Amino acid sequence: MTSINSFPRNIDWPSNIGIKKIEGTNPTVNAIKGLLYNGGSIYAFLYFVIAMFVEPTLQKQYQQRNDFSLFVLLRLRRIIAQLQKRLVMTPVSSLGFNEQNNFVERSTQTSDDNIIREDNSHWAEMIYQLQNMKQELQYFNRSSGQPSESIDDFVFQIKMVTDQVELTDRSRAFSNKSRNIIQGIREIKGWFVNGQVPR
């Protein structure tokens, strides 16, 4: 057994200047680091799953759709070629104007009289009401002899309203657009008339 006298009585403790203080880390920084670390691990796992399983499956499906589209296109071309071989053509010049009922005369243009125009505008009703008001005012003026100042002012206001209605009326623009559409349809019909019609 070691005696008590063998231990030194005075211990030389280090000075406080040589002791380095440990700085504690901020808990917010630790939380952010942990969140980023966990997020990186999750993203890496998702990337692995997508690269190993999802991407090959999508590539296979895309290739299958591409092959199917190519197969359908080739079959359609073959069917169209076979139908064109069976189609008998007759020149338009050999046909008269509606000589046979089993032919369609594609070069016949539609007349403007056959076009049914639906007037969904409310301007006609407004113009009709204004004309009725004008007739009533004229009758009142004739019956009273001389129009009063209030009637003249009212007639002036009616003329202003009529002018505003005429300025906002777009029926002519719509009519011009419909005519342009008809002309465009006729031009398209002319493009398809290439000198041959099916028989």
From Swiss-Prot:
Keywords: Membrane, Peroxisome, Protein transport, Transport. Its main location: membrane. The keyword Repressor does not apply. One of its GO terms (biological process) is protein import into peroxisome matrix, docking. It is a peripheral membrane protein. The keyword ATP-binding does not apply. It is found in: Peroxisome membrane. Coiled coil: none annotated. GO terms for cellular component: peroxisomal importomer complex; peroxisomal membrane; transmembrane transporter complex. Component of the peroxisomal translocation machinery with PEX13 and PEX14. Interacts indirectly with the PTS1 receptor (PAS10/PEX5) and directly binds to PEX14. Required for import of both PTS1 and PTS2 proteins. Present with 656 molecules/cell in log phase SD medium. This is Peroxisomal membrane protein PEX17. The lineage of its organism: Eukaryota, Fungi, Dikarya, Ascomycota, Saccharomycotina. The gene is PEX17.
